[in-house]
Amino acid sequence: MGEVSELWKITAFRRLLIARVVSNIGNGITPIALAFGVLSIPGADAGSLSYVTTAQMIPLVLFMLVGGVAADRFGRSQLVGITDIVGSIFVGISALSFLTSHASIPLLCFNGFIFGMLNALWYPAFSGIMPIIVPAKLLQAANSTVGLAANAGFTVGASIAGVLVSTAG
């Protein structure tokens, strides 16, 4: 427990931990809400959902190496922050399209593709952040604390999505 209290003294670690929890709440909501949302579009079916999810996965695979280079060339922290914020904007656009009854498979595929590209930049940048912000002796505790908190955030997000889908449709 001493290591965790040492971690809390590091401002950059606290910010990263809070950001991961908040972001992962959204990451828990998104796939569930998106699946139900896509299937609610008139004429959409399981194939439509597969197009949307594939549109997100293809750039993730294609651009991961670019993400590694970008993480090395530009600041990892800045890249993580920017990609998280821009990704949230595209998820918000998708959510707004559902709320205003303007959602379409092409729009969701486009947004998914952009989100996948952003994730391809995010993952390599995030994987190298921890050694930059915490001392080596606290690295294991930092990684496990952020991992646990991020998973808790994802679980909370998935639970929120379940409530939203069951009550709001």
Predicted regions located by residue number:
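Alpha-helical transmembrane-bundle signature of multi-pass membrane transport and export proteins
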Residues: 1-169
